């Protein structure tokens, strides 16, 4: 996936904000909370980390081209890092990024969700967020 395609997708998610931090990582947030972190090499994404459900974490961490996200999964958080495209297509990656956005948005305070205009029907059920 190109950096331009990744950026366009993240920009399309309501209230997403961008910051370049941690040594040049492309970090996208909702309500001030990170939902995806990516690195690129020459405009091509070479690693992408995103939040997942516990079931997706257990499945993806054993797939070629995926691992628990460094500095996040080691703290018990359910974050996966895709290091190559052999584990999933770009379309599947975008689905996981959208799911990560929804999981992080669901964890925001009710007040902030309301301020951002996030409808409860757009967010995953509480049980799926753990």
Model-derived regions, located:
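Charge-dense, helix-prone N-terminal extensions
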Residues: 1-130
């Amino acid at each position: 996936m190109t950096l331009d395609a990744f950026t366009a997708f993240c920009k399309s998610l309501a209230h997403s904000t961008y910051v370049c931090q941690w040594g040049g990582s492309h970090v996208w947030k909702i309500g001030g909370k990170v939902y995806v972190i990516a690195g690129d090499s020459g405009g091509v994404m070479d690693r992408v980390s995103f939040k997942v459900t516990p079931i997706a974490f257990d499945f993806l961490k054993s797939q070629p081209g995926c691992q628990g996200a460094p500095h996040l999964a080691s703290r018990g958080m359910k974050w996966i890092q895709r290091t190559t495209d052999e584990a999933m297509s770009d379309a599947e990656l975008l689905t996981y990024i959208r799911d990560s956005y929804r999981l992080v948005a669901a964890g925001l305070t009710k007040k902030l969700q309301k301020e951002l205009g996030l409808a409860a029907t757009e967010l995953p059920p509480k049980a799926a967020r753990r």
